[in-house]
Amino acid sequence: MDDAPIYLDHAATTPLDPRVLESMLPYLTSHFGNPSGLYGAARSARQGLDRARGSVAATLGAKASEIIFTSGGSESDNAAIKGVVWAANAPGAHVITTSIEHHAVLHTCGWLERFGVETTALPVDSEGMVDPAQVAAAIRPTTALISIMHANNEIGVIQPLAEISAIARAHGIPLHTDAVQSVGQVPTLVDSLGVDLLSLSAHKFYGPKGAGALYVRRGTPWLPLQQGGGQERGRRAGTENVAGIVGLAAALDLSVAGMENEGSRLRALRDDLIAGILAAIPGSRLNGHPTARLPGNANFSFPDLDGEALLLSLDRRGVAASSGSACTAGSIDPSHVLLALGRDRTLAAGALRLTLGRHTTADEIDRVQTLLPELVARARLPSL
């Protein structure tokens, strides 16, 4: 149908896979027990939890004991950064990150600065890439952690983590990566990436909201974020969300199993989308690296554009998209990521993020390519 809704905001969240829901249902009904108990229903819940932990670990190339289940990516980022810094227990501990991180990382670093932690937010180039040489140059004797995302949530750029990890390892500094956007889309084996801590979130790969995980390499100095019971081997207090965790593991298995074929399909659709929009809309610009980016990510800037007006126009035509910016008080603030790329505030505020997913079709891409030039023209700001 020509008027069927088009969902192009998969970087924000993905629909729950029906097969994932099916895997979760027993743990919402018959296997409802608390996994810390000793009776039958509790044992069933514990078995589901253990199987999920083993499955996630195998997918990441990790040990089951290195997986901590959380409520999602933001908690995992907080736990990773605060846990390593607290374990360092050093006055003036130093954290290296980048200027384009998710706010779960940037705001955590900012919060730690209130307690004497020092942070270096490295710049990126005009395509959003971090220079490993700048990582090396930023290291101090007090550097306790390097936290650099695997793939950016706005522009999809994939960072050279293997090079960065070699630098971190040579200096004996733990490396954390926010892999919330990349897990399930591109390979994320922890040894290949060379990371010591990795954050992920189920709802980014067709799993349930409210379920995430943190990988912590054995031997990494780290303290838990919250205290209470002895769940997660004493590393994350609170009764586990068993149904959500089972769903996370099932969604990850399904995403990784189809990753190669789906990645190729999405790249072809994405490249067609990018080429069509750049050709049809004068002044349009692709944000991010042309090739080192997630398969389904396309982010554009349009000069002299009212970004909020464009999003509302798209919504009225049945297209769900995003600016990649924080919406506050009825206006769209310029993206901190695009400002870090050197875009001026007008271009940063006139951004459009289109993120494709498992159900995106070539027909939908054609419809957006036909629709967008008209809507961009209508959303242009009046010349002064």
Task: Please name every model-derived segment.
Residues M1-L384:
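Pyridoxal 5′-phosphate
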